[in-house]
């Protein structure tokens, strides 16, 4: 039924951006193991490239790369069959392609070839999360074969013997759906194609079975392995753009739901509106402080909205380009095919994902505008409320200072002498200075209630005033001695600090 079973592999790595170092490391390791594990120790003649990339691994994917049709390097295993590997450049992606096509006398089928390729992958680092984190866009395993009967054409219909043979011999992904044999399609070249991959939309690895007619060896090679110019074949280009699409879906899914971000922003907006619901904005100090904190929280979420919104637009454009490239390569399938199968699934995913990203970006931009407008309005409201509070404090402070100055001026003009004993005068002067200091610190506290250090300064000023008043009282009472003075001053400082703390706590509860 089947002959010339072979395994083709295309590994796509993104060698630009943050993943460049990891992607180059994966490519270099897999390329080296193609030699040590698969025996590909010789260069491929008449390709114009060596067995290693010219200029080393750090030289690509720059614009100065030489080679034929993007070919960077090629290697092969000497002996019967075709055991070759090729490195190709496709813009910012490097494709490592491998063909394991043993000679008939080697007696190797898909199962044995699949196991040999699995041995090439880095031990312990072949998991999907690990490869994704190192810049691998996707991997495609192509199980290729031709019919043994001359003149027969492959047909993927369920009632044909071909489907039973393919099902028995294919090393399908363990997570592939049970109904995969019924999803085969025929492409315009006449090949029968099945996908035996896992059903996850964001899957890293894809597995395709491609069966050609007995006389289509050249056509199958050009479609799945390499062109006459050593370039990436049609199916390889299609799988590259499909891998870009599914990689973007993986990144989008890993970023979490944008709906939760919008919900958090809406909750912050609602809280801010409630805090500033009074006709003239927040009035009391505690209300002003809570509204200010709510505004800061909203501004922090606004930055997250900007980041997610712009990234959604960029991703939507990337998906749009990938979908256009998939369509340019033959509509829902490379070369055209009847509806259904893996290629129609790619096309449907691109359409759905593009619409989803466009909707997400629209909703995010609406939430961002709401956040900006409410935040700007609230900021103005808080500034006016703070300004009114500052004006009130300034008016009270000006009145108090004016009253003191008027009293001092009247005393001086009337030549009135305050009857204070000599020992009391220094203490009285100190008390007046401490009172002036405390008043200024209270003003600072009112202006910046959210700063803890202002409360500390007010406590220190109250302690200083308490100590000065205690000194004044002891001097007026005729208590002498430095020890008594220090004791009284300490007691007064403690009393002043206690009063300041009580007043501060009551203000906080309000």
Enumerate the predicted regions with their spans.
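Acidic, low-complexity intrinsically disordered regions
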Residues: 27, 53, 79, 106, ...
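Hydrophobic alpha-helical transmembrane segments and their immediately adjacent juxtamembrane loops
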Residues: 368-510
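N-terminal juxtamembrane/topogenic regions of multi-pass membrane proteins
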Residues: 29-32, 39, 173-179, 183, ...
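Membrane-associated alpha-helical segments
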Residues: 304-419
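N-terminal pre-transmembrane cytosolic regions of membrane proteins
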Residues: 1-176, 433-440, 456, 505-508
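Extended alpha-helical interaction modules
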Residues: 85-296
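Serine/threonine-rich low-complexity intrinsically disordered regions
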Residues: 19, 159, 281-284, 345, ...
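Amphipathic alpha-helical coiled-coil segments and their boundaries
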Residues: 238, 247, 284-287, 291-294, ...
């Amino acid at each position: 039924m089947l002959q010339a079973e072979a395994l083709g592999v295309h590994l796509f790595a993104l060698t630009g951006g943050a993943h460049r170092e990891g992607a180059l490391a994966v490519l270099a390791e897999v390329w080296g193991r193609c030699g040590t594990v698969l025996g590909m120790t010789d260069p491929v003649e008449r390709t114009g490239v060596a067995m290693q990339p010219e200029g080393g691994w750090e030289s690509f994917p720059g614009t100065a790369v030489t080679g034929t049709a993007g070919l960077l390097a090629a290697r092969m295993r000497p002996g019967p069959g075709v055991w070759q590997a090729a490195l190709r450049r496709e813009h910012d992606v490097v494709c490592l392609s491998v063909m394991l096509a043993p000679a008939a006398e080697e007696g190797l089928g898909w199962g044995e070839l699949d196991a040999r390729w699995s041995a090439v992958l880095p031990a312990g680092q072949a998991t999907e999360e690990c490869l994704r984190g190192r810049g691998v866009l996707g991997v495609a395993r192509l199980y290729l074969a031709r019919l043994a009967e001359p003149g027969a054409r492959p047909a993927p219909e369920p009632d044909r013997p071909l489907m039973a043979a393919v099902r028995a011999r294919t090393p399908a992904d363990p997570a592939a759906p049970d109904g995969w044999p019924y999803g085969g399609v025929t492409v315009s070249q006449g090949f029968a194609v099945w996908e035996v991959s896992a059903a996850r939309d964001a899957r890293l690895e894809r597995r395709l079975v491609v069966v050609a007619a007995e006389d289509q060896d050249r056509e199958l090679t050009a479609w799945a392995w390499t062109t006459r110019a050593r370039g990436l074949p049609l199916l390889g280009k299609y799988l590259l753009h499909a891998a870009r699409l599914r990689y973007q879906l993986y990144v989008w899914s890993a970023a979490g739901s944008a709906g939760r971000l919008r919900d958090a922003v809406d909750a912050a907006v609602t809280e801010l509106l409630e805090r500033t619901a009074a006709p003239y904005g927040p009035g009391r100090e505690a209300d002003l402080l809570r509204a200010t904190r709510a505004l800061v929280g909203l501004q922090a979420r606004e930055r997250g909205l900007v980041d997610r919104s712009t990234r959604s637009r960029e991703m939507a454009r990337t998906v749009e380009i990938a979908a256009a490239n998939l369509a340019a390569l033959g509509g829902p399938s490379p070369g055209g095919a009847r509806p259904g199968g893996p290629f129609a699934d790619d096309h449907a995913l691109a359409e759905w994902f593009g619409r989803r990203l466009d909707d997400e970006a629209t909703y995010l931009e609406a939430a961002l505008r709401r956040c900006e407008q409410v935040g700007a309005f609230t900021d103005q409201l808080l500034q006016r409320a703070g300004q009114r509070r500052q004006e009130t404090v300034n008016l009270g402070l000006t009145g108090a200072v004016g009253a003191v100055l008027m009293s001092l001026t009247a005393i001086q003009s009337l030549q009135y002498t305050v009857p204070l004993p000599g020992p009391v005068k220094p203490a009285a002067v100190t008390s007046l200075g401490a009172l002036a200091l405390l008043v200024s610190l209270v003003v600072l506290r009112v202006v910046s209630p959210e700063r803890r250090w202002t409360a500390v300064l007010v406590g220190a000023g109250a302690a200083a005033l308490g100590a000065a008043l205690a000194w004044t009282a002891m001097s007026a009472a005729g208590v002498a001695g430095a020890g008594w003075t220090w004791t009284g001053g300490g007691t007064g400082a403690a009393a002043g600090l206690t009063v300041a703390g009580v007043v501060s706590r009551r203000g906080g509860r309000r």
